[in-house]
């Protein structure tokens, strides 16, 4: 009667373990996805910094010191001949092509045609450089808004951004509210209160240990690759788990050795130099494929132990 | 009476080539045009032109039409009074804002200063987009996790 309960418990525990393993894998994938999003954000931010520095470096000093109203008027003169020198025009055109090559994520054809028009215009002025770079910066921002996995969801949101609240989505404030005076006599403009979003706690690294142990155990279900075994002392009785007591008469060796089971017995290797003549082909023919694979695994394990022991001795 | 320079700037802004700035409200004229409903006249200290000069564009609604947001730092302010000075309120509530620190209207900005602000605004937009996407991504996947856990039990 009590034996019938054991299989049910083991089955239930197995299901719980499977579920927990799936949840653990899910959390690992979520963490990796969030990390990739962060790296993408960093990449775009550094691209913006690079483009701004390039633009500041390429723009001439006279143009850099101009006031904005004058520059905005220059925008209107994009189709006219510029007052800049020919060498300056060549330099500006080169910077345009450089900015074009620096952009990642190519723009759609509609925007491409606009770029072609700007490139084809003779005597491009600084205003066109500014417009091209600004367009590229904004296109970089736009490219970020269509990530692969949730493209359909983002497409729906893109439609909502056309409404009056579209600007809110772009530059909505997420900073903590500043302190405003509480006196009622002189009422000051106050900032809207924003609720900070609670950050999700990440899983501890200790939770990942059982997964590793399980992977190790799946390789050898009965015995781990390395185990400290003790030979029975002289006169000590070794009890068997499956029947009557067993008297151990084999004396432990003082030297390292390897016992390889073969079909009709056991091949025992000693730490002596082994010549090719001593290895009889008849014995090796009795080795089966599984035993050969086990020997290869043992060889790798022994090599690892030798390497680490050598390092320890040298230190 | 507007000065001829302002009229010329307004005319040039009508072209399509400057529309790339409108999305992020980088230019003062675009910020002026964003005010659909503002409860104060042009004679007030916080008129539309003065608000736009200080970096604010309209983010209000029919019910709360006195809400405005800075295009650089994203600070949103409401509860304006006719005697409020937009620049002072901006510095008071957002002292870390680069545009408020500059305290320089667009007509006195140089191209270099404008480009610095441009970079700041674009990077802010990128960070905002990433934050919104990550939060929605996590929220959707947590919903799926809850459904999975509920179905398994």
UniProtKB/Swiss-Prot annotation, chain A:
InterPro entries: Borealin_C (IPR046466), Cell_div_borealin (IPR018867). Ubiquitously expressed in the early embryo. Expression is restricted to the ventral nerve cord and brain during later embryonic stages. GO terms for biological process: cell division; mitotic sister chromatid segregation; protein localization to spindle microtubule. Residues 178-188 have a biased composition (Low complexity). Disruption phenotype: Flies show multiple mitotic defects, including multipolar spindles that result in large polyploid cells and often in delayed apoptosis. The developmental consequences of these defects include cell-autonomous and non-autonomous defects in cell-type specification and tissue architecture. Flies also display a drastic decrease in histone H3 'Ser-10' phosphorylation, suggesting that the CPC complex mediates phosphorylation of 'Ser-10' of histone H3. One of its GO terms (cellular component) is chromatin. The modification Phosphoserine is found at residues 152, 163, 205, 218, 220, 244. The modification Phosphothreonine is found at residues 146, 209. It comes from the Eukaryota. It is found in: Nucleus; Chromosome, Centromere; Cytoplasm, Cytoskeleton, Spindle. Keywords: Cell cycle, Cell division, Centromere, Chromosome, Cytoplasm, Cytoskeleton, Mitosis, Nucleus, Phosphoprotein. Residues 153-162 have a biased composition (Basic residues). It holds the Pfam family Borealin. Residues 103-126, 138-226 are annotated as: Disordered. Belongs to the borealin family. Component of the CPC complex. Component of the chromosomal passenger complex (CPC), a complex that acts as a key regulator of embryonic mitosis. The CPC complex has essential functions at the centromere for ensuring sister chromatid cohesion, recruitment of the CPC to kinetochores, and chromosome alignment and segregation. There is no function in meiotic histone phosphorylation or spindle formation. This is Borealin. The lineage of its organism: Eukaryota, Metazoa, Ecdysozoa, Arthropoda, Hexapoda. The gene is borr.
